Each structure stands twice: as structure tokens, then as C-alpha cells.
């Protein structure tokens, strides 16, 4: 993997900097590095493809070295270099595609394609010019079963979940009380509602709670907490739990009371915030517990009082909500990130070449299913294919 990264970094620099008119002295170190790459690769044969619709291609390396010049690089020099650069880039692209198409239930973090396994050989170690990539560093640590640390912005840590629970229900569905939520990606939105606006609740207060367990622990997370859940702020028709009928949800938004968010790790509370909104920090957690209250307003204008009558029918439904959004966090496991294209790149390659469903990844790389059942085997394979995708993205946009 380190060799693949070094080849890609060298080729990217060569493509960007070996251009007509450049002073040789400005790129002499790069050209020496480029020549070292050629010397190491010459005389070797590789094969890629042969899975799904990915065609088999054979690669042979027999290239001349780039020479020295006293002045600027001329058109002939650059054209000669370009021929070599384009062949190498095509090779790296195909190695990456081949690697992203394969998976293994055992030691999935190790190279799976024939070409990348060959590049891992001792003869290619001299190509290791630059291993500064975060993904390469973490791949090395994971390969040695040591602790990794990926920094994510908008991590896709929450599997998609949209549902409701009813604490008070009846066949007519005209006086309900409960909680509904939408968890997805890096965001939780939860709303508590009471058609009667807590008129019969103790002290006219209804208590709500929403608990979310993460598939992997996060550390040093920057989080935004808001006293609102905009996705539950408009009327909707909802299917009943048994699917036999539908019921109306017509919210009128109130501000939640006594809001508390707890971040827990292995059942132990690590951080607690009460009535604090905006930016908050969570040190280390694998579970989030949100609790909040709906309080019937003790004083109401006639217009508000008309919204929340003392008895049925309840045409408007008192609702309070919260939004919790993870803005950035560190995770020991690799995750999809809304700010990166790695999952999209891997999925697109596997779809384009009709890669058959293997023993590890779900059909279509379904992220909700993948993260819901995030096994060590999936983690290993995902770290490998994401590392390869990050390498490929240097050369192929």
C-alpha cells in the first residue's frame, strides 16, 4: 500500500511539474525520484482485472530514464516524460480499481489483488518516497493491529432510522402522545408530542427520552445541539404501527424544557450538558441519551389557548424537539464521511464493473446495512478499499 501511495504521489508531482519551459534545476530532485521509480519497475510484469466486468490487462515495464539538461525542459523532453507518466497512471488506476473490487473475510486489511500483492514485495520497498497520508498511516497501524485514529467531518455514524413510539394510543388515533425520530449520517432529530398538550400529565409536564447507540466509539467530538427538530415541524400523515390505518400529525412547536444530553461510554456517563445549546464537546462516547420535556404553557393568550383546548377534539398537536449534529470527531474505525467521496468512489467502481456480491460487503455497498452490522471483517476491508480510493483520488478525479 505504501508503494502504491508513493507511486501515485510521484506521478502526480511529475504530471504537475514536468512541463515545457520549467527550469531543470527546479525539478531535478523530482526527476531523480522519477528515474528511481522507473529503474525499480523496469523488468516487471503485472496483471489486473478478471473480476466482474473488469477486463484482464497485462502490464510490462521497460522505459528509458529521463535525462539531464542545463536549461529549461523542452517539448521533446516533456513529450517523452508524458508517455511514461500516462502509462504509469493508467497502471495505478487499474490496480486501484482491481483492489477496490475485491474483499476477503480473513485479513481484509491486506492487499487482495495480484498486482498490489506483488507491489508489496521487498524489491519495491525503495519506491517508498512519501507516506504522509493519514489513510496510509492508519492502514499501517491497522495492519499491525494497533490503535488508529481517523478525523472525520460529518461522519456517517448513525444508520438510517425513522420511526415513532406511542406512550398513549387508542384505536381512533385522535389523542396520541409519544416520540418520533430520524437518525441518519451525523444527525439526530427527535420530537416529543402530546395531542392534549400535557393537560392530564403530572404538573402539566410530559417527559421524553431518546437513546442512540453508536456502532463505534467517537472521541473529541464537536457537536451542535439545537432546541428544535425542523423535520417534524410540519403536518404529515403517518402509517400506524400495525399498518392498518394512518393518523394525522399536525404539530405546533413549543420550546423544550429541562433539556439534558448525556454522552456515555460502556454505560458510564462521560459528559453531561443541561439546557446548553449551540456548540458542545463530547470527550469519548458510544451512546447518546437525550431527555427533554413538554410543558403546557401556564399562561396563554386567547389565540394560543384556542390551539390547546381543555378537551377533544385536539386539532393541533403540541410538539417539542431537538437536533443533535456531529460536526467533527475522531474514530478508531474508518467511516464514510459526508465531506469525502471515498464511499461514492468505491461504490461507483463496483457498480460500473458489475462486481458480484462477495462475503463481506452488502449489495450495492448499502451504508445503512454496512454500519448497522459493522463487523471486524467489514472494518478491515473498508479501511483497505478507502485507503486505495484515497490514493486513486490523487490521480483520477
Swiss-Prot record:
Q: Which SUPFAM superfamilies match?
A: A virus capsid protein alpha-helical domain, Viral protein domain
Keywords (alphabetical) are: Calcium, Capsid protein, Intermediate capsid protein, Metal-binding, Ubl conjugation, Virion, Zinc
Start and end residues of each stretch annotated as Interaction with the inner capsid protein VP2: 62-73
**Any one Gene Ontology BP term:** fusion of virus membrane with host plasma membrane
Binding-site list for Zn(2+): 153
Task: Kindly list the GO molecular function terms attached to this UniProt entry.
Answer: host cell surface receptor binding; metal ion binding; structural molecule activity
- Subcellular locations according to the entry: Virion
Q: Where does Ca(2+) bind?
A: 266, 286
Q: How is it modified after translation?
A: The N-terminus is blocked. Sumoylated with SUMO1 and SUMO2. Sumoylation of viral proteins seems to have a positive role on viral replication.
Signal peptide (UniProt feature, chain positions): none
| An example Gene Ontology CC term for this record | viral envelope
Any miscellaneous information on file?
A: The VP6 trimer contains a zinc ion located at the center of the molecule. The zinc ion is not essential for either trimerization or transcription activity of the DLP. Zinc-depleted VP6 has an increased sensitivity to proteases.
Assembly behavior: Homotrimer. Interacts with the inner capsid protein VP2. Interacts with the outer capsid glycoprotein VP7. Interacts with the outer capsid protein VP5*.
Q: So what does this one do?
A: Intermediate capsid protein that self assembles to form an icosahedral capsid with a T=13 symmetry, which consists of 230 trimers of VP6, with channels at each of its five-fold vertices. This capsid constitutes the middle concentric layer of the viral mature particle. The innermost VP2 capsid and the intermediate VP6 capsid remain intact following cell entry to protect the dsRNA from degradation and to prevent unfavorable antiviral responses in the host cell during all the replication cycle of the virus.
The family classification in the record reads: Belongs to the rotavirus VP6 family.
Q: What is this protein called?
A: Intermediate capsid protein VP6
Source organism (scientific name)? Rotavirus A (isolate RVA/Human/India/116E/1986/G9P8[11]) (RV-A)
Amino acid at each position: 500500500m505504501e508503494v502504491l501511495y508513493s507511486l501515485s504521489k510521484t506521478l502526480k508531482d511529475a504530471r504537475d511539474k514536468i512541463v515545457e519551459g520549467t527550469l531543470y534545476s527546479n525539478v531535478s530532485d523530482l526527476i531523480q525520484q522519477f528515474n528511481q521509480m522507473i529503474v525499480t519497475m523496469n523488468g516487471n510484469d503485472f496483471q489486473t482485472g478478471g473480476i466482474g466486468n473488469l477486463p484482464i490487462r497485462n502490464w510490462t515495464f521497460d522505459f528509458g530514464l529521463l535525462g539531464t539538461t542545463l536549461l529549461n525542459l523542452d517539448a521533446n523532453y516533456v513529450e517523452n516524460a508524458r508517455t511514461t507518466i500516462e502509462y504509469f497512471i493508467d497502471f495505478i488506476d487499474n490496480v486501484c480499481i482491481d483492489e477496490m473490487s475485491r474483499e476477503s473475510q480473513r485479513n481484509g486489511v491486506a492487499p487482495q489483488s495480484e498486482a498490489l500483492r506483488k507491489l508489496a514485495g521487498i524489491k519495491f520497498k525503495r519506491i517508498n518516497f512519501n507516506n504522509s497520508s493519514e489513510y496510509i498511516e492508519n492502514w499501517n497501524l491497522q495492519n499491525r493491529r494497533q490503535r488508529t485514529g481517523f478525523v472525520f467531518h460529518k461522519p456517517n455514524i448513525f444508520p438510517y432510522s425513522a420511526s415513532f413510539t406511542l406512550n398513549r394510543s387508542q384505536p381512533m388515533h385522535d389523542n396520541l402522545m409519544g416520540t418520533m425520530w430520524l437518525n441518519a449520517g451525523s444527525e439526530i432529530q427527535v420530537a416529543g408530542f402530546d395531542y392534549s398538550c400535557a393537560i392530564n400529565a403530572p404538573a402539566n409536564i410530559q417527559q421524553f427520552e431518546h437513546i442512540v447507540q453508536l456502532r463505534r466509539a467517537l472521541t473529541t467530538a464537536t457537536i451542535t445541539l439545537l432546541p428544535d427538530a425542523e423535520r417534524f415541524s410540519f403536518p404529515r400523515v403517518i402509517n400506524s404501527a400495525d399498518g392498518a390505518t394512518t393518523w394525522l400529525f399536525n404539530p405546533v412547536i413549543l420550546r423544550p424544557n429541562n433539556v439534558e444530553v448525556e454522552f456515555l461510554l460502556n454505560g458510564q456517563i462521560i459528559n453531561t450538558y443541561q439546557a446548553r445549546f449551540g456548540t458542545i464537546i463530547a470527550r469519548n462516547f458510544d451512546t447518546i441519551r437525550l431527555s427533554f420535556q413538554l410543558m403546557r404553557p401556564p399562561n396563554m393568550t386567547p389565540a394560543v389557548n384556542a390551539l390547546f383546548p381543555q378537551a377533544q377534539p385536539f386539532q393541533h398537536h403540541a410538539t417539542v424537539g431537538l437536533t443533535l449534529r456531529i460536526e467533527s470527531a475522531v474514530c478508531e474505525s474508518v467511516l464514510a464521511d459526508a465531506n469525502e467521496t471515498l464511499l461514492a468512489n468505491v461504490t461507483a467502481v463496483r457498480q460500473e464493473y458489475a462486481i458480484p456480491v462477495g462475503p463481506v460487503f452488502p449489495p450495492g455497498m448499502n451504508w445503512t446495512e454496512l454500519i448497522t452490522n459493522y463487523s471486524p471483517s467489514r472494518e478491515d476491508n473498508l479501511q483497505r478499499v478507502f485507503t486505495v480510493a484515497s490514493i486513486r483520488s490523487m490521480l483520477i478525479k
